């Protein structure tokens, strides 16, 4: 869900079928990231669905210990609004719009609460001293002061949440040349100057040099088929760059999936034809290039087809797909929780086989979502039924309910036949999740599966040529450290190359090693014991980010300097020469994306100071190329004009664990005053909110404009502090996390500059659950106020894949589910006041969660809460711009002041 990475040797981003473009500048000067009207050049988000070389994974965090699997971090219950504010790093246009509305909603919802809270904290009897004083009662740890004068202007709320402070970012779509050339990217011209779609050498990104590697793919932004004018919305060039797969008329489905009309555009003739000439208006769910560029596999109406480019014929690979059977694409829960994308079709590297997932959700129960004010486009109720709500039925497996059953199928291109491969000792169908499929060379395929409670993990090697397979790795994570494994998307296939010192095929994986997540190299494929590439009391994060196969160098991002920092490192495939990228600072947060052959990289400095981006050659590349792509001069200018809070990084010790903390202090902070404190949290398993990223958001506004102290604590269960720190929450979500927030609040309440009678906490989604769990456990002793948005209140109501990973099935952990639910209404009644908000059409955290809690409150006659329901709003609560009403209402005036 987070940042995307292009796979090594691939032309696609596997998380989603690629949106067409992300705004880019032609010059070094910064651009306004909220305006693209004057931009004439953009870089295409994705290039092809064909995987023609060993893959590089998406950004995540997996691990194992000496051959034992670990996990990657996923915020399944959030939309990454806190971290990315308004500008997502992946450049996806449709997702960006969703995140914009989502973040605006979050901030404005809480804005109404915080502004009203201001009336409370500044009311008679709550005044504090304003005399200036330079004291020494400050927390220990790093202090980030961006050089902003305390007398600067205050940040308007609309600016803090509206993208004005979002760093300008550039997303590069790296692409391999037709002959494997490195350092190429896909570009799209917006302003009518130059060709519409072309491949360019990264060293000529501004178009100032002539270069033989430049290839024009589409001269114009439109093409015609039978006199129909067609404007492509997404494009994927073939690996040989002779044909472009174009999509139009996109319709969103779930978070990552969509449908559209697909076309084949011939680069030489600049003409196009339907992907399926016999069904040009058929809505296609997914289309992927063959690595040999001579065929496209696609799914339509849940059936898998193949189109051979040498003819206009389309062959059906499956025919029984329908409401409950999916071929080549995931169902809802696999898209959301397992693959984090819409792809379940994989070509072999030689183009001879297609691997595809068969998903059967016949036994999965349906959950109804009622829409009282809206309905899908084209829906017309029967006469006389206009007053009834539209009901959408979703196949949604809740904890303990039947999951979809899956199996991996194969299609032999030459023989035109489908087949399956029986592998001995695999998990039973009703207890199996297929979480990763990695095509290799010579018909080999790596398949990773887990049990539904995500603690038994098996890796199989299947030989499609011989139609046989075997389990080569098997581990029980529960026996290793009591933890879990999450779906992996980072495994990287390493082909044999005796001339480069690699006699056998292998793969790079992330493993748990001595309690931390590290890189390991398995070779040959059947070897269960890896060569450890990294070790130590720190963790790899994006692993690997790139692989230079010519020089046997692996690049990755890690927390070696500090859990809240990110730096780029390299290591040899033999485990030697571990080095930090020389451009890195000691205290910083970096991200990176690599070219096809890892000879070039887009290095992104993301904080704590003003972010910048550079295109540079990799250390293993003698080119010594460097290009400053973004300096964010506009953002630097803003930072000199406005008064921002100072950020104080520290740790606090709770039960022997060191918890990362960031405290945002108002400008002109005076230690003789007594400040109200707002705790903001997310806290989901493996997540991280305290880091060194530059971020101006709603929390900044609260500290800067309202004069509060805003504290964020990453308690136990969060990521990047080792397995012991994280896995302690297993089977008992909410207990340790809430305890840590309370202990942190008590520690802050003892500080001389904190008014411990005015402490509040708030969060969204998992953060909403954590807010209520903290208020429940605290029973009014430390926190007086809270706000929970779209909270989980009973883990039996959330989806099975996510929930059982941390809680096991309810049948196997009844007491844990009871403890993790929000059920102690008596304790909640001890708080001064709390607010619950939820959208009635939330398809992620169902409204059922809030209704169940309300019933408990009603039974015990609890009155110290308020409730706001947003009709027809989903998890983002933006139907009819509902956030505006939240922002305008005087809720906390009435709650705190009584008028």
From Swiss-Prot:
Residues 121-899 are vacuolar. Residues 1-69, 128-149 are annotated as: Disordered. Its main location: membrane. It is a single-pass type II membrane protein. InterPro entries: AB_hydrolase_fold, Pept_S9_AS, Peptidase_S9_cat, Peptidase_S9B_N, Serine_Prot_S9B/DPPIV. It comes from the Eukaryota. GO terms for cellular component: plasma membrane; vacuolar membrane. The active site is at 765 (charge relay system), 842 (charge relay system), 875 (charge relay system). Keywords: Aminopeptidase, Glycoprotein, Hydrolase, Membrane, Protease, Serine protease, Signal-anchor, Transmembrane, Transmembrane helix, Vacuole. It is an enzyme of class 3 (hydrolase). Pfam families: DPPIV_N, Peptidase_S9. Glycans are attached at residues 212, 308, 360, 819, 824, 827, 893. Its EC number is 3.4.14.5. It is found in: Vacuole membrane. Residues 128-139 have a biased composition (Polar residues). Belongs to the peptidase S9B family. This is Probable dipeptidyl-aminopeptidase B. It comes from Trichophyton verrucosum (strain HKI 0517). The lineage of its organism: Eukaryota, Fungi, Dikarya, Ascomycota, Pezizomycotina.
């Amino acid at each position: 869900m987070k940042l995307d990475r292009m796979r090594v040797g691939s032309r696609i981003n596997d998380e989603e079928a690629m949106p067409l473009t992300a705004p880019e500048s032609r010059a070094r000067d910064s651009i306004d990231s909220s305006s693209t009207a004057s931009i004439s050049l953009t870089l295409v988000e994705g290039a092809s669905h064909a995987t023609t070389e060993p893959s590089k994974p998406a950004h995540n965090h997996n691990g194992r210990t000496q051959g034992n699997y670990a996990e990657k971090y996923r915020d399944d219950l959030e939309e990454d609004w806190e971290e990315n504010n308004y500008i997502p790093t992946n450049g996806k246009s449709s997702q960006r719009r969703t995140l914009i509305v989502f973040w605006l909603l979050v901030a404005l919802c809480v804005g109404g609460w915080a502004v009203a809270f201001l009336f409370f904290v500044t009311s008679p009897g709550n005044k504090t001293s304003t005399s200036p004083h330079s004291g020494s009662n400050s927390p220990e740890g790093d202090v980030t002061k961006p050089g902003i004068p305390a007398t600067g202007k205050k940040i308007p709320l609309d600016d803090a949440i509206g993208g004005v402070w979002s760093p300008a970012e550039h997303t590069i779509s790296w692409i391999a040349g037709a002959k494997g050339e490195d350092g190429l990217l896909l570009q799209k011209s917006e302003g009518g100057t130059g060709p519409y779609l072309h491949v360019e050498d990264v060293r000529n990104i501004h178009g100032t040099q002539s270069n033989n590697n430049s290839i024009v793919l589409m001269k114009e932004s439109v093409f015609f088929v039978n006199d129909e004018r067609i404007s492509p919305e997404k494009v994927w060039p073939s690996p040989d760059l002779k044909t472009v797969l174009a999509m139009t008329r996109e319709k969103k489905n779930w978070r990552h999936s969509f449908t559209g009309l697909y076309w084949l555009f011939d680069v030489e003739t600049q003409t196009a034809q339907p992907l399926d000439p016999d069904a040009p208006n058929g809505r296609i769910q997914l289309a992927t290039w063959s690595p040999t560029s001579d065929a496209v596999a696609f799914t339509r109406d849940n059936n898998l087809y193949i189109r051979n480019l040498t003819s206009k014929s389309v062959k059906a690979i499956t025919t029984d797909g329908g409401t409950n059977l999916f071929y080549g694409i995931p169902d809802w829960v696999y898209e959301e929780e397992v693959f984090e994308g819409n792809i379940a079709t994989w070509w072999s590297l030689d183009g001879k086989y297609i691997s595809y997932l068969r998903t059967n959700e016949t036994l999965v129960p349906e959950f109804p979502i009622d829409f009282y004010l809206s309905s899908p486009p084209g829906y017309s109720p029967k006469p006389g039924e206009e007053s009834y709500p539209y009901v959408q039925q979703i196949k949604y497996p809740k904890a303990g309910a039947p999951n979809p059953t899956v199996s991996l199928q194969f299609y032999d291109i030459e023989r035109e036949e489908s087949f399956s491969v029986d592998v001995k000792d695999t998990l039973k169908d009703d207890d199996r999740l297929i979480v990763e499929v990695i095509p290799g060379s010579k018909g080999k395929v790596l398949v990773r599966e887990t049990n539904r409670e995500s603690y038994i993990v098996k890796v199989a090697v299947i030989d499609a040529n011989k139609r046989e397979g075997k389990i080569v790795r098997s581990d029980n994570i529960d026996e290793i450290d009591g933890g879990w494994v999450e779906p992996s998307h980072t495994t990287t296939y390493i082909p044999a190359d005796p001339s480069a010192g690699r006699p056998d095929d292998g793969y790079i994986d992330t493993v748990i090693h001595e309690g931390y997540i590290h890189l390991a190299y398995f070779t040959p494929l059947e070897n269960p014991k890896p060569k450890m590439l990294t070790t130590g009391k720190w963790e790899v994060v994006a692993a690997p980010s790139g692989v230079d196969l010519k020089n046997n160098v692996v690049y990755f991002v890690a927390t070696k300097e500090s859990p809240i920092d990110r730096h780029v490192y390299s290591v040899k495939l033999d485990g030697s020469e571990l080095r930090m990228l020389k451009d890195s600072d000691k205290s910083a947060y970096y991200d990176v994306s690599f070219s096809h052959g890892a000879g070039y990289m887009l290095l992104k400095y993301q904080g704590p100071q003003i972010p910048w981006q550079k295109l540079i050659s990799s250390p293993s590349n003698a080119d010594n190329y460097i290009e400053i792509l973004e300096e964010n001069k506009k953002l630097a200018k803003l930072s000199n004009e406005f008064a921002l809070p100072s950020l104080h990084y520290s740790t606090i010790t709770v039960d022997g664990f060191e918890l990362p903390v960031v405290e945002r202090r108002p400008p002109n902070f005076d230690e003789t005053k007594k400040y109200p404190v707002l705790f903001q949290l997310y806290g989901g398993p493996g997540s991280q909110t305290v880091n060194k990223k530059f971020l101006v958001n709603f929390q900044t506004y609260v500290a800067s404009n309202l004069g509060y102290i805003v504290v964020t604590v990453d308690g136990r269960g969060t990521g990047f502090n080792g397995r012991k720190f994280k896995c302690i929450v297993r089977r008992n979500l909410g207990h340790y996390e809430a305890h840590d927030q309370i202990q942190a609040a008590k520690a802050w309440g003892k500080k001389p500059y904190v008014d411990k009678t005015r402490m509040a906490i708030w969060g969204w989604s998992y953060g909403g659950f954590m807010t209520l769990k903290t208020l429940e456990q605290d029973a009014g002793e430390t926190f007086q106020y809270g706000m929970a948005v779209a909270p989980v209140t009973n883990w039996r109501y959330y989806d099975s894949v996510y929930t059982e990973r941390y809680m096991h099935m309810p049948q196997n952990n009844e007491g844990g589910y009871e403890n993790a639910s929000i059920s102690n209404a008596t304790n909640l009644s001890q708080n001064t006041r709390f607010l619950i908000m939820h959208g009635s059409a939330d398809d992620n955290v169902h409204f059922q969660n809030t209704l169940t809690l309300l019933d408990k409150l009603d039974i015990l006659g609890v009155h110290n809460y308020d409730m706001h329901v947003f009709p027809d709003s989903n998890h983002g609560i933006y139907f009819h711009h509902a956030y505006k009403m939240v922002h305008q209402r005087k809720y906390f005036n009435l709650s705190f002041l009584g008028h």
